[in-house]
Amino acid sequence: QDKQLVPLDEYINTKRKKVNGISIIVDIDGTIAEMNGRGPFEWHKVSHDKSRKFVLDMIEGVVKENDCFVVYLSGRDAICEDDTRKWIYDNTCDYTFSNDWQLYMRNKNDTRKDRIVKEEIFWNVVAPKYNVIGVFDDRPQVLQMWHELKLPNVICVGNPFISF
């Protein structure tokens, strides 16, 4: 198959974003994905999740306005990484950020709380590479952690009264 050439301005823009590191952190479950016929730990069913178009539209607006990169930071077990990547691609293909993102997930069989796993990934991988200008998440414990880290523009897109 022939590779398509990317227009020069698009190529430069993409390179600039990655070097510049301006980004937003986006959670998956409960934020951009709504569980559809599965429990929170049924990783083999993540491909059936429904997208939350309203939230994706908000993310699209932030990406366009700030010319930033999307960092998906998920508490999902890495056992479903391939399905998660495919789900992201399939459900964001209509958005400008569909090919301009990175995914970080918890290690396989890591059962620690989301806030602990995400904070660890943040300090080890995200903070050294990216200038985070906002966060989209749904879990109260994780939202609190982002606030404690003093990240700007922490946006709750779920029901803050539901915990598991």
Where are these regions (language model features)?
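Acidic, Mg2+-coordinating phosphoryl-transfer loop and its flanking beta/alpha structural elements
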Residues: Q1, F122, Y130-F164
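Non-catalytic pre-domain segments flanking phosphatase-related domains
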Residues: Q1-V26
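Short, acidic loop-to-helix structural element flanking the phosphoryl-transfer center
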Residues: P40-V71, A78-D82, I116
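Short, surface-exposed connector motifs at secondary-structure boundaries
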Residues: E65-Y72, V126-V132
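A structural signal for isolated positions on well-ordered beta-strands in alpha/beta enzyme cores
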Residues: F69-V71, Q102-Y104, G134, I155
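Substrate-recognition "cap/lid" segment bordering the active-site pocket of phosphatases
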Residues: A78-V132
